[in-house]
């Protein structure tokens, strides 16, 4: 039975909800980790080759569903996300020195269909275990994510919305 069809118990076709949360959570993680790599804002000199990238989803709470109302599918999703990010910088010193790895999170309080319609998705960027020795690099990572992450998240929202619409019509 396709999701545009109604189940036997709902022969009148007034209302029926189908969950797509498991699919949406997996798809969000796939999209953000595959596409979440950004060149540093103002990256130059020794750090010119550095990138900041989303490495995983720390938490993803919420749901996604398609609701059939009088035979018409209505899709919706609403999640709260916390994404892990990291950036690696060459040590710039002796070959024996370790690269500098900076890590943090991007918190997205509302990753929902409303963001698609409004074309916005606010986020908060944090650095884990700040180190004054690496403050300029940490600040560059935060600035990069603040500048580039909203557009990236809106594109991801649009992809999820479009794919959920396809799932609703099957």
What do these predicted ranges mean?
Residues 1-27, 31-170:
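Long protein-protein interaction modules used by eukaryotic assembly/scaffold proteins
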């Amino acid at each position: 039975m396709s999701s545009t069809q109604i189940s036997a118990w709902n022969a009148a076709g007034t209302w029926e909800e189908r969950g797509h949360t498991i699919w949406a959570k997996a798809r969000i993680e796939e999209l953000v980790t595959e596409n979440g790599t950004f060149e540093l804002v103002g990256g130059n000199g020794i750090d010119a080759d550095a990138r900041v990238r989303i490495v995983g989803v720390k938490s993803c709470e919420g749901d996604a569903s398609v609701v059939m109302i009088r035979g018409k599918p209505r899709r919706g999703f609403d999640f709260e996300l916390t994404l892990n990010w990291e950036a690696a910088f060459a040590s710039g010193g002796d070959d024996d020195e370790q690269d500098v790895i900076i890590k943090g999170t991007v918190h997205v309080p509302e990753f929902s269909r409303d963001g698609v319609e409004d074309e916005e998705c606010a986020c908060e960027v944090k650095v884990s275990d700040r180190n004054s020795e690496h403050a300029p690099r940490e600040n560059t990572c935060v600035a990069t994510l603040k500048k580039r992450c909203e557009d990236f998240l809106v594109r991801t929202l649009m992809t999820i919305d479009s794919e959920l619409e396809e799932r609703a019509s099957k």
